[in-house]
C-alpha cells in the first residue's frame, strides 16, 4: 500500500535462539518438592513464549504448569519480564511445588531427571516420503540442582552422553557433590531440510535425547 513498507525479520544463527533454564529442586523424604526456576528465552524462542504476557495471571500459571512433566504441580509465584530490544527476550521466574516428585517404593525414591522437557517429542516411525523440515534451529540448556532429602543417598544415575549428528548435538552431564545432584542438558538443533532416507537417523537422535530427558534417578534410604 502507498506509504507502507515491508520489514523482513532478521535471520539469526541457530545458536542464538536460546532457552536457558536454571532450577533448584528441594526434595523431601516423602517425594514432596519445592522448585525455584529462572527461565530465559531469546529471539525465535522468545517469539514462541511471548504470547503469555497477554494472558490473565491465573492463565499464565496454567501455561507454566502445562509445560512441566510433573503431576500435582502448583505454581506458587510467577514473575515475567519481557525485553523488547533488537535481541528480544522473555524471562520467567517462578516457584513450583508438588506432592509427588517421582514416587516412593519401599526404601527407594525414583525421581525424574528433567521435568522441563515435556514438549520434546519423538515422531512416530513411518516410511517417510517427504523431506524432513526443521524450520528454525535453537539451543536449549537446562541446569538443574536437586537437593537430596535427609537420610538418602544416590543409588543410580543416568549415564551421561555426547551425541553429534547432522541434525544437531546433545550433551548431558550428571554428578553428585555435597548431598546434591547436578544435571546439565544441552541440546542444539540445526535448521535445515533433510532427505526422507535420513528419517531413521533423525528418529534415533530424537529418541536418544528423549531417553536422557526422561531418565530416572534412584535414591536409597541409608
Predicted regions and their residues:
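A sensor for short, sequence-defined functional sites
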Residues: 1-222
Amino acid at each position: 500500500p502507498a506509504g507502507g513498507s515491508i520489514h523482513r525479520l532478521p535471520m539469526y544463527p541457530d545458536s542464538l535462539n536460546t532457552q536457558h533454564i536454571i532450577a533448584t529442586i528441594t526434595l523431601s523424604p516423602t517425594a514432596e518438592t519445592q522448585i525455584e526456576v529462572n527461565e530465559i528465552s531469546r529471539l525465535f524462542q522468545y517469539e514462541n513464549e511471548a504470547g503469555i504476557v497477554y494472558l490473565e495471571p491465573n492463565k499464565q500459571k496454567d501455561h507454566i504448569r502445562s509445560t512441566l512433566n510433573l503431576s500435582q504441580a502448583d505454581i506458587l509465584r510467577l514473575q515475567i519480564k519481557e525485553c523488547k530490544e533488537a535481541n528480544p527476550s522473555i524471562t520467567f521466574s517462578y516457584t513450583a511445588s508438588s506432592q509427588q516428585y517421582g514416587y516412593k517404593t519401599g526404601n527407594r525414591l525414583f525421581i525424574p531427571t528433567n521435568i522441563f522437557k515435556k514438549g520434546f517429542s519423538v515422531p512416530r516411525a513411518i516410511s517417510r516420503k517427504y523431506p524432513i523440515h526443521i524450520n528454525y534451529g535453537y539451543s536449549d540448556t537446562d541446569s538443574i540442582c536437586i537437593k537430596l532429602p535427609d537420610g538418602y543417598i544416590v543409588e543410580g544415575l543416568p549415564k551421561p552422553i555426547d551425541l553429534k549428528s547432522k541434525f544437531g548435538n546433545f550433551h548431558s552431564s550428571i554428578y553428585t557433590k555435597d548431598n546434591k545432584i547436578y544435571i546439565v542438558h544441552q541440546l542444539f538443533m540445526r535448521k535445515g531440510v533433510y532427505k526422507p532416507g535420513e528419517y531413521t537417523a533423525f528418529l534415533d537422535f530424537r529418541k536418544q535425547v528423549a531417553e536422557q530427558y526422561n531418565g530416572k534417578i534412584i535414591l536409597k534410604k541409608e
